[in-house]
Amino acid sequence: MIINSLKRFGITTGAAASAAAKAAVIGLLNREKRNTVVIPTPIGLRLEIPVEKVEIDSGIACAEVKKFSGDNPDILDGLVIRCCAKLNESNEIVIVGGKGVGKVTRSGLKATMGETAISPTVRDMVINAIREVTDKGIQITIEVPNGDIIAENTLNKMVGIVGGISILGTTGIETPVSDDDYLEHIKCELNVIRQSYDFVVIAPGNSAAKYASKLFDSNSIIKVGDRIGDSIKLASSVFRKVILAGLPAKLLKVYAGIFNTHYSQGDARLESLTHASVLAGLPYDVLTKITNALSVEEAFTYMTKEQRRKVMKIVAEKILSRIKSFNGDINFCVIIFDYDGESLSRVGC
């Protein structure tokens, strides 16, 4: 039996940009085309990163580095980050976002509204990498070929970054199969919402967000996927009120105490529904059908609308109780929608 216990780490877009910038500056000043460069990182490690291409012309040099995501399932894996370097008359390093790098259109993010989406940490990484080569003034333009197209498949638009991807990274290194970046995205989006609202609506998925938008301004709603517990904790520290709005199947997991609802973390949907149905006093014949159902949706077909309301009220109350148990000061509300978008239960609202 072969056990694959070694996972591959990757590099962030920020590390790729730093490497491309350093390679471009070496090409500009030394007329040298490097196959690899070594860059410093904020955590003290040094990374040797392959350089795909270096182009040297009169007064300018450009280098390309491919982002490598390791064992992370990442749409940006293999993305080309291109940096072009030229001298400027100052002694400063000026970093400009070019084609394919997104622009920030809303406040609450690390980059200022109106600027390109290059995080302050990445700017420091680029400067530190270049300063290992020269003390001269340099202008660096970061580009991402097809970045505007690739960005359509990312979460950037939801946080107000348009026209391209973000150049990010806090360490320069991507941990394998890590969802830290997704939590960072949730933090960013919560910060954006906080600029306009003192409450936030947490919706696990698209349908929940759609139904919630009938009750709340769509700009106050954040889609968090499976990270319900983490999102509630993050939101509770910055918002006056936190509202969890979802469909039965997802929230039945939370009823059972499963706050990361990814399938790999557990599944107790039908067991939870059966338990809540017993507490609601549903007839034995209905309970039997529920326990034999293959899905929550199927189980719902055996219940009247009034029975659904009674059961989901119990579910919502239990979720409220669970949330209060680890954050007693939170002003929390639970809304459960039926599969047609009708509100079945509202507790704490």
Swiss-Prot record:
Enzyme Commission number(s) of this protein: 2.1.1.195
SUPFAM superfamilies, sorted: CbiD-like
Keyword Transferase: yes
Lineage top rank: taxon: Archaea
Protein keywords: Cobalamin biosynthesis, Methyltransferase, S-adenosyl-L-methionine, Transferase
InterPro entries cross-referenced by the UniProt entry: CbiD (IPR002748), CbiD_sf (IPR036074)
Gene3D superfamilies given in the database record: CbiD-like, CbiD-like domains
Catalysed reactions listed for this entry: Co-precorrin-5B + S-adenosyl-L-methionine = Co-precorrin-6A + S-adenosyl-L-homocysteine
Metabolic or biological pathway: Cofactor biosynthesis; adenosylcobalamin biosynthesis; cob(II)yrinate a,c-diamide from sirohydrochlorin (anaerobic route): step 6/10
Keyword Chaperone attached: no
A GO BP annotation: methylation
Molecular function via GO: cobalt-precorrin-5B C1-methyltransferase activity
Similarity field: Belongs to the CbiD family.
Protein name: Cobalt-precorrin-5B C(1)-methyltransferase
Organism of this sequence: Saccharolobus islandicus (strain Y.G.57.14 / Yellowstone #1) (Sulfolobus islandicus)
Biological classification of the source: Archaea, Thermoproteota, Thermoprotei, Sulfolobales, Sulfolobaceae
